[in-house]
Amino acid sequence: MKKYTLLRTFMLFIAALILCGWFSIHTQAAITKGVKAPEQTVCFEPDTTSVLKNPLTGWVMYLGRAWDENFWQTQRYDAMPVNGGDSTVRVSDYAGTCYIRINWNMLESKEGKYVWNDPDSRIYKLLASVRERGMRLAFRINVDSRDQGQNTPLYVKEAGAKGFQDPNNSQIWSPYPDDAVFQQKYEKFLQAFAVAFDDPDKVDFIDAYGLGKWGEAHGVKYNDY
């Protein structure tokens, strides 16, 4: 008898839920039936003057790798003359990305010491000045030292990496890209770089060059090729 009472109570409860659901649906339908949404006209005025800073589009500004954070004033990027010098503009109001071709040695001259972690370093301040103006960064990291300076940190050579001297300057050394020690050290650096800069709010792109003269894949020299 007790089991029958519990079952009957349960069935009544389910029926009540179904009835409440039906009533709710039909009540809502009755309320909204015949109610016409007010007409609304939306007009858009074309913007033909503003520069849209979308990823991978728009103006890209090249950044001198020897510059410091004051270049905005010294190079007049905060007050660039236009219209024959009658007026000035801030370049950062138009360019959305700041691209710098930098080298590994400038970012990690000593193993494990990354300039982006040092607020007192020139590179840290330079990159920070870009971000302060609402621009994203873009990078190429050169490792071949020919025709430039010491682009790969010498700790890589001291660790046993094989390489070659610049024919025009015996004091300048470059690693062979297929050398195992170079690859090990460079991979470690790139992993640390990715942790710091794998952020689309900070970085627009990082190009995949870096080998060869000027990081443009010209005259790449291998050890076993």
Task: Please describe what each predicted stretch is.
Residues L6, W22-S24, E45:
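Residue-level detector of bioactive/disordered segments in secreted/extracellular proteins
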Residues M11-W22:
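Bacterial N-terminal signal peptides
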